[in-house]
């Protein structure tokens, strides 16, 4: 009954969304849309985490609800509701890192009693989430990402006061684990981040040639670490200052070049191309970049390297002080700004992530507040034409 009630409210809101789209943005039918996914229980709060495209059959959205419970939403290629599912209350803390593999969706969450990282599997046939694997020695999962031959899982070990990186193979089996000392207990900050009662922190990880990088607590502060891909041994670090100054996003370009963003005591900087010494020690506040005062203080920033009409573009998505989603497009080769694009006008919007779509467009996942107070999932689709107009 609960799922049916949610289903009805989704359908009603999607109908309203279709009618109102033309008033908000000049979108091309069938290739562009704005969808806001509502819940008839107004007290419920939804905080989207990640999105993945399922071939040509639409999108799968992972979300938290009511602080840190786990929710999944399936929509078709036009953003229309297909089905949804709320996991049992003991599976909490869904983290960024959502994968479509062999017609199934995979993501990590956490057991609320043991705190153990748990791998979930979801299919369109089951329309539910099933436990695929439990990692009993990995607690407080924070972020996961895909690499060439598997996956990375970042977590926090409260017993050793350390950030842990676990390398998983393509079947999600453990290859190696390594820890990096924080030197103090940051469990309270971790819990505040996970339950969303305090500052949200920019955990991320990725691959750069024969090295991996991760952003997490190290040496008292949020820092970006560089490690060997073969065993996780640390080679370099860019130190932040506590949780007040740090790297907020990073994407590897080539050679020693990265596309970064950083925050420093409320100010935000975008660095579309910079060479880093991944075998040395640096400080995030020393990295020069363009300040962007329009962004929210200590803004969350999401970046990807995407192809736009045959041109490699570093795309950044973030949130503005005025309650809009802002996209920045930079040439990935020379780092020059190509264009910007604002999304959202009627309700306040926050950027969560985005994915380049199979039809050459862009699907932007966001958070919006209906009537200024009810936190809901939103999906904004840009057509290939709209993307090319500002990003190429």
Regions found by a protein language model. Name each.
Residues 45-52, 91-100, 136-147, 185-205, ...:
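Repeated scaffold domains used in trafficking and secretory/extracellular systems
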Residues 1-3, 11-46:
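Bacterial Sec-dependent N-terminal signal peptides
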Residues 65-69, 111-116, 156-162, 217-222, ...:
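Short glycine/acidic-enriched loop and turn motifs that connect beta-strands
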Residues 33-42, 81-88, 127-134, 174-179, ...:
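A short beta-strand motif characteristic of beta-propeller blades
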Residues 350-392:
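Blade-level signature of beta-propeller repeat domains, shared across WD40, Kelch, NHL, RCC1
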Residues 51, 60-62, 72, 83, ...:
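Hydrophobic strand positions within the blades of repeat-based beta-sheet folds
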């Amino acid at each position: 009954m609960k799922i049916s009630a949610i289903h009805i409210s989704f359908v009603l809101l999607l109908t309203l969304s279709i009618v109102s789209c033309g008033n908000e943005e000049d979108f091309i039918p069938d290739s562009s849309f704005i969808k806001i996914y509502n819940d008839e229980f107004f007290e419920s709060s939804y905080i989207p985490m990640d999105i993945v495209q399922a071939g040509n059959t639409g999108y799968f959205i992972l979300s938290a609800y009511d602080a840190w419970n786990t929710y999944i939403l399936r929509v078709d290629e036009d953003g229309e509701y297909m089905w949804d599912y709320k996991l049992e209350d003991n599976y909490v803390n869904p983290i960024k890192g959502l994968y479509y593999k062999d017609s199934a969706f995979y993501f990590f969450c956490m057991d609320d009693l043991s705190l153990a990282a748990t791998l979930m599997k979801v299919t369109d046939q089951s329309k539910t989430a099933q436990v695929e694997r439990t990692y009993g020695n990995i607690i407080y999962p924070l972020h996961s990402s895909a690499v060439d031959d598997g996956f990375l899982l970042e977590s926090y070990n409260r017993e050793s006061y350390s950030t842990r990186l676990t390398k998983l193979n393509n079947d999600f089996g453990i290859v190696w684990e390594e820890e990096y000392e924080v030197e103090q207990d940051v469990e309270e900050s971790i819990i505040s981040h996970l339950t969303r009662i305090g500052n949200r922190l920019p955990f991320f990880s990725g691959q750069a040639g024969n090295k991996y990088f991760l952003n997490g607590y190290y040496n008292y502060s949020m820092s970006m670490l560089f490690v060997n891909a073969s065993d996780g041994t640390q080679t370099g670090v860019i130190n932040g200052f506590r949780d007040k100054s740090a790297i907020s996003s990073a994407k590897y370009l080539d050679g020693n070049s990265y596309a970064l963003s950083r925050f420093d005591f409320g100010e935000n900087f975008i660095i579309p191309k910079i060479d880093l010494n991944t075998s040395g020690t640096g400080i995030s506040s020393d990295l020069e970049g363009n300040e962007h005062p329009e962004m929210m203080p200590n803004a969350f920033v999401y970046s990807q390297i995407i192809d736009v009409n045959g041109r490699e573009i570093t795309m950044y998505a973030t949130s503005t002080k005025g309650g809009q989603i802002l996209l920045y497009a930079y040439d990935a080769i020379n780092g020059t700004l190509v264009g910007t694009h604002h999304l959202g006008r009627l309700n306040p919007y926050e950027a969560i992530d985005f994915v380049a779509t199979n039809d050459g467009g862009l699907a932007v996942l966001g958070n919006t507040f209906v009537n200024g107070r009810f936190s809901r999932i939103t999906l904004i689709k840009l057509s290939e034409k709209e993307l090319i107009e500002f990003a190429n």
